[in-house]
Amino acid sequence: TKNFLPHMVEQGQGHIVNVASVGASFGVPGVASYCATKFAMLGFSEGLKHELSGTGVDVTVVSPIMVDTPLFDHPSFENFSKRSTIAILSPEKVANTILKAANSSKLEIVVPSVARAGIWAKHNFPFFINPIIGNAFRKQLTKRTSKK
């Protein structure tokens, strides 16, 4: 962004697409640092979108729920995908969404779109959703640390 943005503004056109995660909306036990980086990317993208208003340069952040990458090999995610009821997205699906995002005026595109309901529920009913998320991941974290 630092290298290309001045040229985009000079030309009066361009689109920056950043990738975060649905984890930007949920602080999750055991992967707090991961969630923090995603919170940061979403905040950076939102601030930059406001700063660039009227320049012809836009910003969109793509937030996939879970992508089939080596990240799931990390101990923090041990057995998570096996017990998850949420479909894990292919990298190709996310890549296609990133390409489409370059033509979108939205700040954030959540993939799959049904995950937006979880984000909405978390923001509107945190007293209900936060304990569910916390307990589910805490159980996983306890299992992992008790194996050591």
Language-model features: where?
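Active-site helix of classical SDR
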Residues: 1, 37
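Alpha-helical segment proximal to the catalytic Tyr-Lys
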Residues: 6, 50-53
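Conserved active-site helix of classical SDR/Rossmann-fold NAD(P)-dependent CH-OH oxidoreductases
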Residues: 39-46, 50, 57, 96
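Conserved catalytic-site region of short-chain dehydrogenase/reductase
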Residues: 24-26
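A short helix-coil junction within the Rossmann-fold of NAD(P)-dependent oxidoreductases
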Residues: 3-12
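Active-site loop immediately N-terminal to the catalytic Tyr-X3-Lys motif
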Residues: 28-32
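SDR active-site lid
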Residues: 54-113
